[in-house]
Amino acid sequence: MNRLLINTPITANWDSDTNIDKKTIMDAVNALRSSHADIAYPYNGIVYQTSDILQIYYLNTKDIKVLYKNLNKLDFLYNQPIYGGDVFVNKNKYIDAGMENERNYGWGNEYYDRYNRFTNLGYNVYRVDAPLFHLCHSRKENSSFRPKTFHHIFSNELFRISNSSK
């Protein structure tokens, strides 16, 4: 285990291509600190895809209000709420749940795996009522979409996890 994790009660799993209002981060962390949650998402499952132009403007201003003011110009990254991107977890619960599933390959699969394992274990899940922003980027080797074979493998693993119990 990472030395930095030894002394912290909360761990975070954060996608580097996302951004969110710092107030939602504090809301999620406070839900964990007050024991109202075991796992806390600093957003409501809605993820907006930034456009190239809006992203450049946002990065120049570093003001999250730029993204909020332009929500009507953004597309949804997915057509349904998701459980990935950014998440905070009670460290001890995270360890008890097995941390990350090393059977997952690539990006995205671990989101649903983690959520299903934690809910199957009866963990309290908290979501902040705010969107997450995905910063647009090109898809290269490490972020490209995987062949169908990997989707089949992940589907089988997700089915296994979804049907597991304590």
Annotate each PLM feature.
Residues 21-102:
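Conserved catalytic core of nucleotide-sugar-dependent glycosyltransferases
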Residues 6-9, 99:
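Active-site acidic short loop of glycosyltransferases
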Residues 1-4:
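Glycine-rich, basic loop-to-helix element that forms the pyrophosphate-binding segment
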Residues 8, 36-38, 123:
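Short, high-confidence coil segments that cap the C-terminus of an alpha-helix
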Residues 18-19, 45-48, 94, 131-133, ...:
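Short, solvent-exposed loop/turn segments at secondary-structure junctions
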Residues 75, 81-82, 91, 102-166:
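C-terminal catalytic/acceptor-binding lobe
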Residues 8-19:
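Short beta-strand-to-loop acidic/aromatic patch adjacent to the donor-nucleotide binding site
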